[in-house]
A protein has these predicted regions:
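Asp-based, Mg2+/Mn2+-dependent phosphohydrolase catalytic module
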Residues: 1-13, 103, 119-120, 124-222
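N-terminal helical cap/lid subdomain that shapes the substrate entry/recognition surface
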Residues: 3-100, 119-121
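Residue-level marker of regulatory loop/turn positions in helix-turn-helix DNA-binding domains and
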Residues: 94, 115, 147
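Catalytic-core regions built around general acid/base machinery
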Residues: 97-109
């Protein structure tokens, strides 16, 4: 799908964090490998049983705020998820195209707002290890509002909090259900990321334009 952004009529760019500005390899390793392994060892069950149990637990709360909540998973699984996140902090890395794109947005006068479903502790750890905050104008965790990006109430709350105009906003995310929610609210430009995890094959979007390198946007932006 062709990317057609009228940059003259965009004043705000909302950006997801994990998979969009940061390599999703961190989260995929943490939630798909480390958590099941740690839980299985603690419970004395096989890796296969641990994987299946964790998969069921994830599926039960998918697209809700609990899915992203470290406190919820600590209580649910009996693991210190916050401490585990802190220990894995050095694994968090920026995408190669993140800083050039954010710098270009700044140079062209666009407001750069992080909008992440990440738990505040998760966000703080990643900011510490990546320096991402210095390239953004505002950082928002949806936990502050009580709703994830999949929920229309979140979009209303963010609009009230930031004063953004949906008609003049570009939103970039690596989740099609979340892009759908943004489009439903009225965000004019919704753009998907095809390579959120540098170690996995690219993904495809059915309803939104997408790309694998933000540097492709810079010539039209400048």
């Amino acid at each position: 799908m062709h990317i057609d952004i009228d940059w003259q009529n965009v004043d705000t760019v909302l950006l997801d964090m994990d998979g969009t500005l940061l390599d999703l390899a961190f989260d995929n390793y943490f939630w798909q490998k480390l958590v099941p392994e740690t839980y299985g060892a603690q419970q004395g069950i096989s890796p296969q049983d641990a994987q299946e149990y964790i998969r069921q637990q994830y599926h039960a709360v998918q697209h809700t705020l609990n899915w992203y909540c470290l406190d919820y998973w600590s209580e649910r699984l009996g693991l210190d998820i916050c401490a585990m996140t802190t220990a894995q902090g050095p694994r968090a890395v920026l995408r190669d195209d993140t800083v050039p794109f954010l710098n270009a947005l700044k140079a062209s006068g666009k407001r750069r707002i992080l909008l992440t479903n990440a738990h505040p502790h998760n966000l703080a750890v990643k900011l510490e290890h990546t320096g991402l905050a210095s390239h953004l104008d505002l950082l928002l965790s949806t936990h502050t509002f009580g709703y994830p990006k999949e929920d229309q109430r979140l979009w209303r709350a963010v609009t009230e909090e930031t004063g953004i105009s949906a008609e003049k906003t570009l939103f970039i995310d690596d989740s099609e259900p979340i892009l759908n929610a943004a489009a439903r609210f009225g965000i004019r430009y919704c753009l998907g990321v095809t390579n959120p995890d540098s170690g996995l094959a690219e993904k495809h979007y059915t309803r939104h334009p997408s790309l694998n390198d933000y540097r492709r946007l810079i010539p039209s932006l400048m």
